[in-house]
Amino acid sequence: MRVLALDYGSARCGCAVSDPTGTLATPIDHIERPGTRKGLVRVADLARAREVQRIVVGLPLGLSGHDTDQTRETREWADKLRDRVAPIPVELFDERFTTAIAARSGDTRTSEDSRAAAVLLEDWLALHRSDIA
């Protein structure tokens, strides 16, 4: 199953995609201003072009697991994305610490946002490995 992971932010949306077997997570180019109509269209076009079967959106919960203003904004954006990409399922997944892990990777070939999306996708794939196989 090919999965697209998104690390949403109002300025940029980090993107990563899995291989068809759901084994590898690869960061790809980020999308600027994803909250705009044009940004949502670009995300939807990316999902279709990559032929993904699921989209995973990082949910930025507070350290104690509570919702923050960014959590609420992300939920609203994911709802808009869900409408735009139907019937592709859109799932929210806890993204705590993904940006910190991505920052430590030191890889400068892709944006930190897309590296964070790849960490998110690796976590999601590991949790769902038996469902994908």
What are these regions (language model features)?
Residues 1-6, 10-133:
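Phosphate- and other anionic-substrate recognition elements at nucleic-acid/protein interfaces
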